[in-house]
Amino acid sequence: MIRGNDPILLTPGPLTTSLATKQAMLRDWGSWDAAFNAITRSLCDDLVRIVHGEGTHVCVPMQGSGTFSVEAAIANVVPRDGKVLVPQNGAYCQRILKICKVLGRASVELPIPEDQPATAALIEEAIRRDPSITHVAQVHCETGAGVLNPLQEIAALCQRLGKGLIVDAMSSFGAIEIDARTMPFDALVAATGKCIEGVPGMGFVLVKKDVLEASQGNSHSLALDLYDQYVYMQKTTQWRFTPPTHVVAAFRTALDQFLEEGGQPVRGARYRRNCDALVQGMAALGFRAFLPAAVQAPIIVTFHAPADARYDFKTFYARVRERGYILYPGKLTQMETFRVGCIGAIDDNEMRNVVTAIGEVLREMGIKMQAPLAEAA
């Protein structure tokens, strides 16, 4: 894959981008210019098509990181007297709970072990206990540990019970199938610097037309008002406030490459090959994956840390980095673990090279693989 000579980012975003995507940022754009506005329009149309939302959903782009768009979606879709159920099995679910608190939206936490997925049965039980719940906010791929939550069954449940569904698809959009026709949702949030393989700086919300139209006045914020952003764009073709022009241009190039590759099925298959090569190679070195294969998303893999006393993550991270690979620093699980991403402009050959580099570092540090640490550090 052509990407230049930068280090390989083994993270769930930002991630390694292609050379063409990098080169797309070498041109300057006027944010009011018709050519730039046409790029924005084409992006929105293509993003809606990826989830088969033509006619039912619209795309509202938003400046900033993906979290900006998650907050915007909750603030707009959930009325001020609404109540949000948050199935919580990782760090990004916890972030949604914090957003609800800051927004003044009532929320209910549904605790789930970090190595297990949310299920429709658990969510239905929580809603039966508290019928005042109006919405469910579900992280699709919880990259704290790498769990893939079953979106289709959760979407069907919310539809059956008449509850709104907000999906954080930050780390799944473009890699894992999402079909608005069979997985009904009120709003779905993703961002440029993830599985489409753009660079960070813009999020977007795919929202049902009628839900967006009913959201006028819900937002706590001027800058994060999805309704106002959409209405202004429809009237003027422009963004309300200065957009990240270079990010948008790079995303257009990244999306073109995504479509040329074959779209979600082919992109997802490449990431699955990456994941399989990583897990198999790490197992040969003696590492054990934190999650069972049945719930492991092909986005990022969490591994138990070696039990050897000579293991120190900072040293391990630095020495792997010296070999051209940047791991995801730190852990988000209760147990001592580290994470390796499978996404970006990389393939399974690169993943095997990563495993080789990790093996070299283990030998260099004198680490002998034993049973994983059983307790939190």
UniProtKB/Swiss-Prot annotation:
UniProt superkingdom: Bacteria
Segments crossing the lipid bilayer: none
Modified residues (N6-(pyridoxal phosphate)lysine): 194
Catalysed reactions listed for this entry: (2-aminoethyl)phosphonate + pyruvate = phosphonoacetaldehyde + L-alanine
Coiled-coil parts of chain: none
UniProt-listed Pfam families: Aminotran_5 (PF00266)
Cofactor names: pyridoxal 5'-phosphate
Entry's EC annotation: 2.6.1.37
Keywords noted in UniProt: Aminotransferase, Pyridoxal phosphate, Pyruvate, Transferase
GO MF annotations in UniProt: 2-aminoethylphosphonate-pyruvate transaminase activity
GO biological process terms held by the UniProt record: organic phosphonate catabolic process
PANTHER family in the cross-refs: 2-AMINOETHYLPHOSPHONATE--PYRUVATE TRANSAMINASE
UniProt family annotation: Belongs to the class-V pyridoxal-phosphate-dependent aminotransferase family. PhnW subfamily.
Quaternary structure, from the entry: Homodimer.
Role: Involved in phosphonate degradation.
HAMAP family: PhnW_aminotrans_5
UniProt cross-references to NCBIfam families, sorted A to Z: PhnW-AepZ, PRK13479.1, transamin_PhnW
Stated name of the protein: 2-aminoethylphosphonate--pyruvate transaminase
Taxonomic source organism: Cupriavidus necator (strain ATCC 17699 / DSM 428 / KCTC 22496 / NCIMB 10442 / H16 / Stanier 337)
Lineage: Bacteria, Pseudomonadati, Pseudomonadota, Betaproteobacteria, Burkholderiales
Gene name tied to this protein: phnW
